[in-house]
Amino acid sequence: MILPIYLYGQPVLRKPTEDITPESLDLKQLLSDMWETLAVAEGCGLAAPQIGKAIRLFIVDGTELAEDYPECQDFKKVFINPEIIEESEEDTTFSEGCLSLPGISENVIRPASITIRYLDENFTEHTETYDGFAARIIQHEYDHLEGHVFTDRISPIRRQFVKTKLTNIAKGKVAARYRTKR
């Protein structure tokens, strides 16, 4: 089922998320719905808060980007209860957008590589290091689990420039090519 994507201004996007267990929800159905929603929205990542769930879960699919970003080859994963345990000292800057903030894209500075510990959809633990665009996608989605959106990471002057757009999104005065909830 295609779920509505919660827009900027929804309290769940700022709420702390909780760890999940195999018993805490119907994970198989939720993941199926999230993958379907992500595909229709044509995004490369979707976090549970973006569909109204304050839980520590996000999915990524960077496979469409692999031609330009080789590190995204076969980069389709589920991250449950993730924890970024290491960040590189080197930073990179890249323009980011977000399904919860349609029509806004801004340059965001992030660590160039990260190491993350997480559980997959079978609740098997992994510790992996990512760099480049794959690391950026993970950090963007991870921010949602921490109650942040990418505009929190832009310069104060740039935030002033997008303030009206953010206000309009929060009021539902925005067009998106996918189902939304304000």
Identify the meaning behind each predicted range:
Residues 1-139, 144-182:
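Active-site rim/adjacent substrate-binding subdomains
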